[in-house]
């Protein structure tokens, strides 16, 4: 009897650990509901088109963790209020089945948090999902930026921290903004030692941006948040629909 109880307790602890791990690795981060694009009702043509686009994406391989999809071909210009555009960009280490999983989590979260909105964006740790009635492909969405910072400040060797961080950022900026091809997915990661610590960092752009657009987007983040956050905090992440950046004094990516 006691052995059965121990086995049940062990299984419960294992399930708790698995669920906790999943929550940490793909936690909800933020959402934005766009009220300017109007709303749709349950069972409407817009909702049917949206569901169909999501189903279509579900059948894609998502080898590079990205798609920009619509229910119309060539993203034609139209005043049809039922056209749907969907962007899915998964984090560079979350592709294939991991990206599919994040898609379904994000779509469910978006429908709950922005119920009936034709335009909305939601961020999870492993992906960003945007639905829209307007074609946003290739645009830098400056209105979508937000930041999350580590509560701990840099307490010592501040000048060394700043210099090392800037060198690493420069390296990753160049890596993420090479010509996009099968060998480069607008995603760069790296690390550098700062005294006894290591800094881990990543930069990524949505693959609908051009190489120049990616550079402009990441440069905008660095310029806007540089002195106030990056030189003071032990870790910060800045996210948007178009590009993202993160650094921490602990590893946060999949190996």
UniProtKB/Swiss-Prot annotation:
Q: Give the subcellular location.
A: Secreted
Q: Which UniProt keywords apply?
A: Repeat, Secreted, Signal
User: What organism does the record attribute this protein to?
Assistant: Arabidopsis thaliana (Mouse-ear cress)
Q: Which stretch is the leader sequence?
A: 1-21
Family under the similarity heading: Belongs to the cysteine-rich repeat secretory protein family.
Q: Which InterPro entries does its entry note?
A: CRR_secretory_protein, GNK2, GNK2_sf
Provide the protein name. Answer: Putative cysteine-rich repeat secretory protein 13
For the Gnk2-homologous domain, which residue ranges apply? 28-136, 142-252
Single GO cellular component term: extracellular region
């Amino acid at each position: 009897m006691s052995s059965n109880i121990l086995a049940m307790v062990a299984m419960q602890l294992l399930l708790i650990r698995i669920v906790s791990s999943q929550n940490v690795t793909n936690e909800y981060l933020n959402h934005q509901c766009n009220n300017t694009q109007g709303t749709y009702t349950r069972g409407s043509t817009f909702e049917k088109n949206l569901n169909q686009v999501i189903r279509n994406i579900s059948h894609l391989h998502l080898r590079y963790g990205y798609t920009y999809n619509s229910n119309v071909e060539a993203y034609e210009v139209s005043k049809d209020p039922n056209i749907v555009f969907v962007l899915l960009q998964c984090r560079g280490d979350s592709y294939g089945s991991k990206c599919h999983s994040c898609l379904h989590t994000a779509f469910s979260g978006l429908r709950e948090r922005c119920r009936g909105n034709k335009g909305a964006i939601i961020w999870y740790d492993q992906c960003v999902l945007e639905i829209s009635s307007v074609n946003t492909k290739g645009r830098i969405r400056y209105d979508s930026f937000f930041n999350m910072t580590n509560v701990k400040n840099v307490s010592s060797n501040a000048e060394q921290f700043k210099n090392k961080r800037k060198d690493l950022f420069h390296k990753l900026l160049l890596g993420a903004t090479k010509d996009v091809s099968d060998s480069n997915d607008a995603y760069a990661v790296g690390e550098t030692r700062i005294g006894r610590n290591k800094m881990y960092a990543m930069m990524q752009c949505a693959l609908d941006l051009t190489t120049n657009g990616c550079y402009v987007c990441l440069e905008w983040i660095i310029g806007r948040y540089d002195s106030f956050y990056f030189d003071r905090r032990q870790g910060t992440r800045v996210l948007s629909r178009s590009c993202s950046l993160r650094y921490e004094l602990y590893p946060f990516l999949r190996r």
